[in-house]
């Protein structure tokens, strides 16, 4: 029987995951219907729809993997873990492309590269989505290779017991997984970081200029840009929060008790909060939500 704190984190993890699946499922349905009705979607909505679909799958995979690991279905849990790596890497790259897209479209900096991208990035989005799938597939191959090697080592050492301890008790697997995480996650995270910082700085400059020309506190344009800046700031904070929790969890020995469930609750709460901001910052999704409720 798990301790009370562990039980609380388990409940938080499952509730947050189910709520996030409902939320991302709603986003998928709204944007999917528009995609089918118009046979096309704006470039930004295309990325958002892909991101919502990936997050929906990630939460489902996490629930299934944890249930399998809890009942010591080691082989099945490891197979699901490979699919998790694919989906998680895909989410990192989709988030990076979304940040770059908004940075290019909204920022007011007059750099030749930004001008060139402003006219072409919408046409590049389908290709970027394909690139994300390819990188996700590469991540899955690397993960599958590491799992196979760890399985052989575990068998050769005659390990028996909880499958969650099996792989992560091996120094080889923990370092292998850490290097894999650095290779697959840090590049899109860095692109996201730079894009959001540039966009936030550009929005801040724009808000200050508008306040100087329109000193009225209730100016609608200033309010809209201020709200966008606040939403972006919260998205930025929650995403860093999620990323750090994920990296820390990749360097620690996993346990089905104690800290494992705390890390799971923190990581998936971060994804859930990011999805909330994404939902309310999209006019189409916000309108659809108001019509439903």
From Swiss-Prot:
Q: What keywords were assigned to this record?
A: G-protein coupled receptor, Glycoprotein, Membrane, Receptor, Sensory transduction, Taste, Transducer, Transmembrane, Transmembrane helix
Please verify whether the record's keywords include Transmembrane helix. Answer: yes
Stretches that traverse the bilayer: 7-27, 56-76, 80-100, 128-148, 182-202, 228-248, 265-285
Q: Which residues lie on this side of the membrane: Extracellular?
A: 1-6, 77-79, 149-181, 249-264
Supply the source organism's classification: Eukaryota, Metazoa, Chordata, Craniata, Vertebrata
Cytoplasmic face residues: 28-55, 101-127, 203-227, 286-293
Q: Where in the cell is it found?
A: Membrane
Q: Which InterPro entries match?
A: TAS2R (IPR007960)
* Summary of the function given for this chain in its UniProt record: Putative taste receptor which may play a role in the perception of bitterness.
Secreted: present as a keyword of the record?
no
What does the similarity note say? Belongs to the G-protein coupled receptor T2R family.
> Pfam family of this protein, just one?
TAS2R
BP GO terms, sorted:
detection of chemical stimulus involved in sensory perception of bitter taste
Q: What is the protein's name according to its record?
A: Taste receptor type 2 member 143
So which residues have sugars stuck on them? 162
Recorded GO cellular component terms are: membrane
GO terms for MF: bitter taste receptor activity; G protein-coupled receptor activity; taste receptor activity
Q: What is the source species?
A: Mus musculus
Under the heading CDD domains, the entry gives: 7tm_TAS2R16
Domain of life of the organism encoding this protein: Eukaryota
Q: How does it sit in the membrane?
A: Multi-pass membrane protein
Q: Gene symbol?
A: Tas2r143
Any remaining note in the record?
Several bitter taste receptors are expressed in a single taste receptor cell.
């Amino acid at each position: 029987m798990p301790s009370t704190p562990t039980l609380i984190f388990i409940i938080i993890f499952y509730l947050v995951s189910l709520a996030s699946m409902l939320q991302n499922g709603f986003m998928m349905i709204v944007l999917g219907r528009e995609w089918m009705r118009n046979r096309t979607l704006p470039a930004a909505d295309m990325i958002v729809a892909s991101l919502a679909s990936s997050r929906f799958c990630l939460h489902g995979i996490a629930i299934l993997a944890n249930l399998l690991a809890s009942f010591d279905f080691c082989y099945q849990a490891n197979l699901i873990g490979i699919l998790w790596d694919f989906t998680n890497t895909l989410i990192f790259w989709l988030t990076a492309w979304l940040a770059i897209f908004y940075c290019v479209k909204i920022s007011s900096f007059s750099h030749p590269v930004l001008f060139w991208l402003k006219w072409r990035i919408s046409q590049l989005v389908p290709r970027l989505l394909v690139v994300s799938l390819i990188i996700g597939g590469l991540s899955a191959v690397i993960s599958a290779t590491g799992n196979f090697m760890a399985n052989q080592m575990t068998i050769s050492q005659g390990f028996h017991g909880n499958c969650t301890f099996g792989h992560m008790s091996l120094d080889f697997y923990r370092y292998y997984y850490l290097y894999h995480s650095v290779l697959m996650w840090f590049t899109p995270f860095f692109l996201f970081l730079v894009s959001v910082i540039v966009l936030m700085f550009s929005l801040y400059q724009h808000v200050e200029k508008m306040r100087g020309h329109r000193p009225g506190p209730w100016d609608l344009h200033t309010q809209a840009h201020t709200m966008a800046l606040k939403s972006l700031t919260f998205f930025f904070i929650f995403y860093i929060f999620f990323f750090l929790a994920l990296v820390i969890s990749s360097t620690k020995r996993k346990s089905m008790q104690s800290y494992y469930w705390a890390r799971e609750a923190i990581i998936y709460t971060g994804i859930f909060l990011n999805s909330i901001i994404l939902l309310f910052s999209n006019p189409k999704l916000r309108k659809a939500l108001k019509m439903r409720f």
